[in-house]
Amino acid sequence: MTDPHDQTGARRVFEILQEPDWFSGLSPREARLLDGGLAFHCLARPGERIRATVLRTDGPHLPSLTDHRTQRIEWADDRRVVGTIEAHATGTPVPTTGVVDVVLDLGGPPGSLMRLELPPGRVHAVRSVVRGRAPVVFDVLRQLRTDRLENRRLSRPIPRVGRADVTSAGSSRGSTKAVLFGLHWLELGGAEKWAAETIGMARAAGLFPIVVSDRPSGHPDIARPVFDDALVIPLTHPVPAEHESRVLSQLFERFDIRGVHVHHCTWLYQRLPWIRAQYPGTELVDSLHVLEWRTGGFVDIALRMSNVMDQHHVISPQLRDYLVDQQGLPREKVSLATLADLTVDPSGQRAEPVSTRKAGDPMTVAFVGRFTQQKRPYLFLRLAARLRARLGDRVRFIVHGDGELASEVRADHARLGLAGSVQLRGTDQPVAQTLDEADVLVISSDNEGVTLTSFEADAHGVLVVSSDVGSQASVVLPELLLPRAPLPFLRAAEDVLVSLCEDAERAAHLLVEQRGKVDAFADLPRARDWTRYLYERWAS
């Protein structure tokens, strides 16, 4: 049997003293989570023998791999001991005496994590009940708060960290050329899909990928081929302070990290000033996707850290204009390079922008996306109920996705009486099949950058109707852009879709116009080209 560790970069930083029999019983996902935990603890304690007690559960519990709980030799009653394993950092003698005990909890299976328990506290409980029983009312209040925060954020300067004046050569480095990546989590949708693409590009350029993530997750995609031969460390928080600098120092001492590329990773963003001070020759860049008015999100963090960073890559004109025109960053420091070709090759085979709906056929309206508060699937279901009441059998619906609101989506589906008209599809079915059947894709999100599904829909000859958020106006026709606020969104979406259903000739004309708009956006600089040039320079 092939050792699962041979498929990752883990062997570069630690060795297992004796592989136990139970190891072959781990799923590939669990084996890689264990790899990440062992890599972290061996790097945090080079020269010591690490003895890990490995746990798992069937319940909806996230992994615990690097946080302070790993130092406690007790655990909850619903955890099962998988076994124990010993390892030590490579490049150091095997200790003959003494051992450091850690407890690595691999968590529950990915399916159970869709039913995560609420965070503790009455506020979270009340919030969940209100959202479940009255999601539109909840959303109305949420959007009013967003409006206030947006106006406040536009009028206030964002503080910046001090500039780095380090001129020394910095600390010692290893010899293997590498890139340190920061990811949100290992769930490959949206921004993470682009992050995974860059990891493959780094490998193709001859750079070794080192990946850290900082968002709680079961990391269902950690076993994807893109992470083969990479060193992947899924952080769980809070990480003991004394381990942070040791792990980062060990990575830089073992590898020649030519650059850091941050993709939505708060932990790594906040360590950039330290990296700049200790390793000033390392280039620091990020990729930014979306403005988040409620929290500021990653754009605010990037602005705070901009004085120690070399370049910001943005995927939309909206982000470029915000950073340059409103926040005053030098234009040469902000690179616009789009993801128009990430999931669709604009020069490849695409459906003709011609409606395939025959006379008498119902119009098929689709929702494709994660079931999250941001994507607002509950709005789509209420839109479907309105259209069903108004158009009857002349319209049908597909809701394609999964996520943390899955149980609420199913409850809404039943409560609104949509079983006969709205088909629910999971992520086990191809999105391409849904888009082949659809005439219109509705994007009901309350925030986006530029959705990849907009490009995919156009490639399938599907009209896109979208809330007017982020830079969606770059690819969606003005007459198909809808208000962000939920009640105006529902009213406008209902009118637009009734019009498209009743006027097939107009729908066909709009499809041609949409293709032209998408093609114009695709003519902007491409993120693949920008990144390829960057990595080739780092590798030289």
Regions found by a protein language model. Name each.
Residues 446:
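Aromatic "clamp/platform" in nucleotide-sugar-dependent glycosyltransferases that forms part
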Residues 463-467, 473:
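Short hydrophobic beta-strand element within catalytic cores of glycosyltransferases
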Residues 229-236, 410-426:
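Nucleotide-activated donor-binding/catalytic signature segment of Leloir-type glycosyltransferases, i.e.
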Residues 192-197, 367-386, 404-407:
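A conserved mid-protein helix/loop that constitutes part of the nucleotide-sugar donor-binding site
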Residues 137-138, 296, 309-334:
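A short, active-site helix/loop in glycosyltransferases that binds the activated sugar's phosphate group
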Residues 2-178:
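Non-catalytic membrane-proximal stalk/linker segments that position and tether the catalytic domains
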Residues 502-538:
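A charged, aromatic-enriched C-terminal amphipathic alpha-helix characteristic of glycosyltransferases
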